[in-house]
């Protein structure tokens, strides 16, 4: 995209409840949106403010039913548009209640939310026990047994460094390279939930849910770290376990180079 000197780059941090969305990415047919998406709703709100179409770039494409605590989105607008900080109240007054803008800032014109992200962190929430409260169901995976957290972390320790993650990619994944650099993969307890947190430079389609489903399945059958490592090294999705349901998954945070988060000095 060619950047005009009369434009500024705005970075939004948004949170959304993915329950009633067909994912992040807008889906159009003959110019009309065919399904309700987060990107579609956000661009409609931005277009209403600016009186002309505004295109956005998201840091990642969450699937239907997947949530975000801190999705990062950038867009360009006229340099004379409202101050960056004013986009928070302006957008929140227009957007549906299942999307909230948490922060808005002017950043370097070189920043692209997707291509300049250094890392992305996801969290997957699991609630263990006989039953759960009704209001928890859209935001967690309920399992009746209590997994062995030490065993889960022993297997998850295989997820470190540069890895070919083909075994955990969905059939429709179109990534040219299946290699991803994983910085962290760990299970822990927080507020009575079993949390799986994973941080990597990028992810394959349904990769996190495939990893979670596989690890929980292997723990249930008493498998070992070697069994998980064998699946990883097989590079075959059919060797892995089931895909965990979408509602437990949250896009948690995005990291960018510090220099790209700074606004040009000549603008306000």
Curated annotation (Swiss-Prot):
Record GO biological process: tRNA pseudouridine synthesis
Keywords from the UniProt entry: Isomerase, tRNA processing
Recorded catalytic activity of this chain's protein: uridine(38/39/40) in tRNA = pseudouridine(38/39/40) in tRNA
Source species, domain of life: Bacteria
EC number: 5.4.99.12
Residues that hold substrate according to the record: 122
CDD domains in UniProt: PseudoU_synth_EcTruA
GO molecular function annotation: RNA binding; tRNA pseudouridine(38-40) synthase activity
Record has Isomerase as a keyword: yes
Catalytic residue positions: 63
Quaternary structure (record): Homodimer.
Role of this protein: Formation of pseudouridine at positions 38, 39 and 40 in the anticodon stem and loop of transfer RNAs.
NCBIfam families tied to this protein: hisT_truA
Protein name: tRNA pseudouridine synthase A
Organism of this sequence: Treponema denticola (strain ATCC 35405 / DSM 14222 / CIP 103919 / JCM 8153 / KCTC 15104)
């Amino acid at each position: 995209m060619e950047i005009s000197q009369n434009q500024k780059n705005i970075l939004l941090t948004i949170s959304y409840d993915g329950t009633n969305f067909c994912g992040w990415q807008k889906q159009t047919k003959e110019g009309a949106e065919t399904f309700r998406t987060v990107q579609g709703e956000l661009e409609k709100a931005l277009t209403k403010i600016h009186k002309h179409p505004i295109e956005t770039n998201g840091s990642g494409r969450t699937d239907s039913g997947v949530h975000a605590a801190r999705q990062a989105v950038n867009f360009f607008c006229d340099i004379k548009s409202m101050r960056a900080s004013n986009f928070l109240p302006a957008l929140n007054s227009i957007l549906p209640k299942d999307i909230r803008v948490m922060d808005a800032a002017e950043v370097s014109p070189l920043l692209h939310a997707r291509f300049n992200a250094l890392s992305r962190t996801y969290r997957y929430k699991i609630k263990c026990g006989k039953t759960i409260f009704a209001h928890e169901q859209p935001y967690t995976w309920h399992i009746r047994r209590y997994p062995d957290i030490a065993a889960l972390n022993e297997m998850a320790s295989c997820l470190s460094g540069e890895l070919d993650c083909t075994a955990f990619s969905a059939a429709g994944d179109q990534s040219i390279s299946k290699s991803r650099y994983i910085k962290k993969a760990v299970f822990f307890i927080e507020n009575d939930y079993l949390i799986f947190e994973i941080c990597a430079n990028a992810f394959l389609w349904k990769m996190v849910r495939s990893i979670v489903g596989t690890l929980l399945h292997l723990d249930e059958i008493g498998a070992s770290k070697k069994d998980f490592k064998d699946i990883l090294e097989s590079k075959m999705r059919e060797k892995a376990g089931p895909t965990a349901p979408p509602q437990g998954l949250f896009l948690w945070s995005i990291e960018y180079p510090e220099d790209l988060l700074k606004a040009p000095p000549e603008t306000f």
